[in-house]
């Protein structure tokens, strides 16, 4: 396994790089997570999507629903984890990989640890709240009894472009409303 460090150019963040032996599968499943993000966008939610895979099959899908449900915990990862637990009839999601378009926040990273997900793959880095390497890494806290493996930056530009376009549109709509008042 090859590893080194690099500086993520947009944020000046030092990240660990290692060879991803699952890249083809990771790209395939991240495209499925992007489809979920587009569902969120279609209902005017922040476009974040998630799929959970076990034995090369999607067992759960989720996308952001905070505005729709008015629930602060209705993040894509939480929605998918709840569905996966129900489908497998267990809270232990051992042997599962979670794919999400944006780096998990503290709440979602905690839920991933608590549900014993084996591996996490995310697309876009979150410089304001990412807790799997950008702001901090909850997966590497030694006192925790579970430490998921993780890969970052898979289809990063596609995932971050979805978010950038969404928020650009929101800002434009806000400007248009303030001009018309």
Residue map of PLM features:
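A short acidic/small-residue loop/turn micro-motif
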Residues: 66-68
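Helix-adjacent hinge/juxtasegments
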Residues: 73-74, 78-113
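Short beta-strand scaffold segments in enzyme catalytic cores
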Residues: 48-56
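Zinc-dependent deaminase
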Residues: 7-11, 17-43, 91, 104-181
